[in-house]
Amino acid sequence: MSMYSLSIAGLLATTLLLGACGSGNSSPIVIGGDTGTPVEPETPVQPETPVEPEVDKRLSGGDTTVFSESSSAFETPAPNLEGERLDKHLAGDVAFEDVFVTAPAPVNSGLGTIFNNSSCIRCHPRDGRGRAAEPGVDQESIFLRVSIGNDPLTGPEPAPGFGLQFQHRAVFGVEPEGKVDVAYEELETTFADGDTISLRKPVFTIVESYQPLPPGLLTGARVAPPVFGRGLLEAIPEATILGWADELDDDNDGISGRTNRVVDPISGATRLGRFGLKANAVSLEVQNAGAYHEDMGVTSSIFPVESSFGQTQYDELLDEAEVSDETIENVTFYVQTLGVPARRDVDDSEVLRGEALFTEVRCAACHIPQARTGDFPAVPEVANQLIFPFTDLLLHDMGEGLADNRPDFLASGSEWRTPPLWGIGLTAVVQGRNEFLHDGRARSLMEAIMWHGGEAEESRELVRAMPAADRDALLAFLQSL
């Protein structure tokens, strides 16, 4: 029985045993007897107002939350999976780790001919972030998007001889497109109290390209982001995201988040983009098929043409799809049903103070703390959940410091989709290091904050003006996520 329900039996018992109030007579009231004792009117019982249950801020992913602070925190199944649904998740887990090899082969055949990596897990180790670029080495989980222009309706225009992604590896006997190298500049910035911090600025260079780079080549570096929680983000109703948008800054708060509208390669329709660092993918299915296609050179029914089409590396064999629809479906379900790590230390006074500061300096204007998912029949485990992702899934101008100057559909060269912050405090535990932002340049959360510009410049300057104790509290809050 609910704590808010009245017991009928108890109410009757109470009525039978109550004495006459204010009469000085302790004799029981008799109901329906012959004694002639008057029956006193029953005092109306006012129903209690139900109390809304207190929100448990630990439950970042609602019913999909996992209570793990280990290195496996990002790769744990949602706890509300069971039976055949859990089996399907585990099948997707196997496919996520499968390594593709050069054709012909009995399994996982069709790698390349040019590619960046050979499996999902190598770009997303432990289902988390990839590694930032390192000078003078073969890059493992960072790549360059390339193009020579952009049509807001149809998207980036492929670079002749290089397509839409620079692929630095190739199968035996085939020439890769070249190599990517990086150098870092250290830029010192100072807080109002005199403390300093060094910001690492990457400068990427294409070397040993197999042919001359085309004039006007646009490039943008991408480090693979974490993959957990994406099913919940996919289940946020489009109306909710549109309600967060404020493209013309009608409320005059300096924040003008807007949506990206991109072509769905399955239907051909233009739809809301919500995945990818510039919100250029309409669904997880499309994003995953795109990763097979561009990152691994593996074709599918969604992207049936080799990524090297029109180049000297093109494989002219008329192969069937190299990854099956079933595998794409299983990998998509796997990503949709990964659990979200629980928040920690939610009642700690320092964390609570940092949470208040997070709102006060208006970080929460873009990193919206909570959302509710809608109906999602394909994956009911993520439907109708109160979640705490800290994102609005919108594009925001982040200023020239973070700009790659490569537009993508409606996204300008300085706009980025707000990344979710859930789980960010466990990054070092899972990945063994801290590297943040779209290209992994930030080695700490404070570095990431101080790179914010554009719409976030005012918030950054408010953080700069904080005393060290307040900055520490802000970081304590972020570490609790």
PLM feature spans:
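PRPP-associated nucleotide enzymes
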Residues: 13
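Periplasmic c-type cytochrome electron-transfer domains
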Residues: 22-481
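C-terminal motif of bacterial Sec signal peptides marking the signal peptidase cleavage site
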Residues: 18-20
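Bacterial N-terminal signal peptides that target proteins for export
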Residues: 1-10
